[in-house]
């Protein structure tokens, strides 16, 4: 079974760059406090890195 990580949106997407909004949607995050579980892959890690100031990650 692949390792998973929990990602929680902690800040609003209002007023952010369209690229950052698209990254949040790509991760499956829609609102503040929303948490999703994703497979721990380099692609997901890159997306998290792009919006690291807006999300909290739990291993």
Swiss-Prot record:
Signal peptide: none annotated. GO terms for cellular component: cytoplasm; cytosolic large ribosomal subunit. This protein is located near the guanosine triphosphatase center of the 50S subunit. Part of the 50S ribosomal subunit. Keywords: Ribonucleoprotein, Ribosomal protein. It comes from Escherichia coli (strain K12). This is Large ribosomal subunit protein uL30. One of its GO terms (biological process) is ribosomal large subunit assembly.
């Amino acid at each position: 079974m692949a390792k998973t990580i929990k990602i929680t949106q902690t800040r609003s997407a209002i007023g952010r760059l369209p690229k950052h909004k698209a990254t949040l949607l790509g991760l499956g995050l829609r609102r503040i406090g929303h948490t999703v579980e994703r497979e721990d892959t380099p692609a997901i890690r890159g997306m998290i890195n792009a919006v690291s100031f807006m999300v909290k990650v739990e291993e």
